[in-house]
């Protein structure tokens, strides 16, 4: 996010970025359970940082790809504490993550993950913005549509970036991408862009 922080600052928001075990600068083994556990600890730490700094502004949770699962998990457990959730190149739950990782699942495991995904997404009532590339073959756009359909949020939107794939979403959709995020933040955080 180093390359994007100026873009976030230009729309008058602060940015808190975290890495998970086995991703970015995080050490350890990346697993679905670890990332969900880590997301709760990270959110608790984030709230402590805000409290220590006497910062009490609105909170938007954002996650990309595998990070979207952690963002969904936080949103599902903290609807009242956040102003919204933004996902980028997201999927509707851990079942898809297991499938693309090549993990063999029994029918019972598939059913359990499917139920977990539905419960997770159905419990989210915070406003939601989903951003996805139309040419994303790593996580097909149908996954974002499934997620959109599962969310209980009354205020939700999905935007797609034509010709964008998993890695070039921000580059190809730059103006539309930032406009959508800006509008979402200003609408759901009750702040003015000026």
Place the predicted regions along the sequence by residue.
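Acidic catalytic loop of the alpha/beta-hydrolase fold
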Residues: 135-139, 166-168
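The serine-hydrolase catalytic nucleophile loop
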Residues: 1-7
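Hydrolase active-site cap/lid region
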Residues: 70-126
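Conserved alpha/beta-hydrolase
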Residues: 9-27
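Alpha/beta-hydrolase active-site loop
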Residues: 29-52
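Short alpha-helix in the alpha/beta-hydrolase fold that links the catalytic acid
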Residues: 126, 140-149
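Short beta-strand/loop motif that positions the catalytic acidic residue
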Residues: 123-125, 130-132, 136
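Catalytic histidine-centered segment of alpha/beta-hydrolase-like enzymes
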Residues: 164-175
């Amino acid at each position: 996010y180093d390359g994007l922080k100026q873009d976030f600052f230009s729309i008058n928001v602060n940015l808190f970025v975290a890495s998970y075990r086995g991703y970015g600068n995080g050490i350890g083994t990346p697993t679905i359970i670890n990332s969900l556990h880590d997301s709760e600890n990270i959110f608790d730490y984030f709230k402590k940082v805000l409290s220590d700094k006497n910062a009490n502004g609105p909170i938007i949770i954002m996650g990309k790809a595998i990070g979207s699962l952690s963002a969904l998990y936080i949103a599902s457990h903290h609807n009242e504490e956040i102003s919204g959730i933004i996902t980028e190149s997201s999927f509707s739950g851990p079942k898809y993550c297991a499938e693309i990782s090549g993990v063999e699942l029994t029918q019972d495991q598939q059913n359990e993950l499917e139920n977990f995904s539905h419960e997770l997404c159905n419990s989210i009532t915070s406003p939601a913005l989903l951003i996805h590339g139309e040419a994303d073959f790593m996580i097909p756009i149908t996954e974002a549509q499934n997620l959109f359909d599962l969310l209980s949020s009354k205020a939700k939107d999905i935007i797609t970036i034509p010709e964008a794939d998993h890695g070039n979403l921000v580059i190809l959709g730059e103006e539309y991408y930032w406009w959508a995020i800006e509008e979402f933040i200003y609408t759901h955080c009750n702040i003015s862009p000026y």
